[in-house]
């Protein structure tokens, strides 16, 4: 059965409550995954981590192959999220979306997905001072982070911490973690 058929059939059903499409964005080591894990302790949602999907194909982040994987990953995320929302499940997506968040078309795509699945969209961006991000990258010690650390200034040029943000909530993860989570949970609900 195709997704459009499912959408038509499922849209006739009324879920008990409106599902939430929650997207957590931010540069690597901005605190997205820590925030996501804590939210999931307090809010039931299907969890999609972009890096888990990408890393199954490649750890390389600079090649044309990665760009193709990235595009396919985003399509897969959209499909998985859409199907789950149609079944009334909350969905939390954890992904950098570093260039995408500056593009209104990206926002419009998720706004349309939320509308088509009768869900509420919640966009959250994690930020932190660049010194903290650099320290977190070093502490994390992933091979995929070595090029970022080697050319940290160029990395920040490609993936700036502060951008023109078209989302809804921005959280500084260098601040009080418990308060941030409390604010996010209030925003989500």
Predicted regions and their residues:
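The conserved Walker
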Residues: 28
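Conserved substrate/cofactor phosphate-moiety recognition/catalytic segment
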Residues: 34-86
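Hydrophobic anchor at the beta1->P-loop junction of P-loop NTPases
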Residues: 24
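Glycine-rich phosphate-binding loop used to anchor ATP phosphates in small-molecule kinases
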Residues: 72-117
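Conserved phosphate-donor/acceptor-positioning beta-strand/loop module used by diverse small-molecule
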Residues: 115-137
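Conserved glycine(s) of the Walker
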Residues: 31
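Small-molecule kinase domains that catalyze NTP-dependent phosphoryl transfer to phosphate-bearing small molecules
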Residues: 139-183
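Extreme N-terminal, non-catalytic leader segments
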Residues: 1-19
